[in-house]
Design a protein with these regions (language model features):
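Conserved binding/recognition cores within well-folded domains
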Residues: 25-130
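…primarily DNA-binding HTH/wHTH and HhH modules…
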Residues: 148-151
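C-terminal structural segments of small proteins and small subunits
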Residues: 133, 137-138
Length: 151
C-alpha cells in the first residue's frame, strides 16, 4: 500500500483513498476518519457545555446512572449511556472493560494480569482501571487485532 501526502495551502483538507476494493482495514481507516467529525457533548461541574474529540477520551464510566467522560485534563457528564457511546463510536479504539466502563486502548500504558482473571490497566496519565474477568478474554483478542463477539 502506498501513502502519498500532498500539502496545498489553498484547498480545504481532503483525504482521497484509491483502492481496488474496500478491505476491512481500509473500512476501519474510513470509519476512523469519519468519526473525527463526531464530538461527544459533555457538561462540566458549572453546567457549561463542552465537546470532546473521541480520540482524547481516556475512559468512560457510569456511576449511579450517570455517564462520565474522562480526558487528560477534564471530566464531564454526558446524557448518552455507555451502550449508546459504544455503538456510536465503534471505530474508535474503545473497549467495554466492565459493565460500567469503556476504556480507550490508545491511552493504555501497561497491563497486569491478576490471579482472579481480571486485568489492571494503567493509562498514560498513570490512572489505573480494572478490566473485569468477564471481559478479559475479549480484551486480549481486541489487543491482538482479532475479531471478537461483543457481550
Amino acid at each position: 500500500m502506498k501513502v502519498k501526502v500532498i500539502t496545498n495551502l489553498v484547498v480545504e483538507d481532503e483525504i482521497l483513498i484509491q483502492c481496488k476494493s474496500i478491505t476491512p482495514e481500509i473500512q476501519r481507516v474510513i470509519d476512523l476518519l469519519e468519526s473525527q467529525n463526531k464530538k461527544i457533548e459533555c457538561i462540566d461541574t458549572d453546567n457549561q457545555k463542552f465537546y470532546v474529540n473521541p480520540i482524547d477520551v481516556l475512559y468512560i464510566e457510569s456511576i449511579d446512572g450517570t455517564t462520565y467522560i474522562y480526558t487528560s485534563n477534564r471530566v464531564g457528564k454526558t446524557r448518552s449511556t455507555l451502550q449508546e457511546l459504544e455503538d456510536e463510536y465503534t471505530t474508535a479504539d474503545y473497549f467495554r472493560g466492565a459493565k460500567n466502563l469503556i476504556v480507550n486502548i490508545q491511552h493504555i500504558e501497561s497491563l497486569k494480569s491478576q490471579l482472579n482473571g481480571r486485568i489492571i490497566v494503567t493509562l498514560n496519565n498513570e490512572e489505573m482501571l480494572v478490566i473485569s474477568r468477564h471481559y478479559a478474554r475479549l480484551f486480549k483478542q481486541k489487543l491482538k487485532g482479532e475479531q471478537y463477539e461483543k457481550i
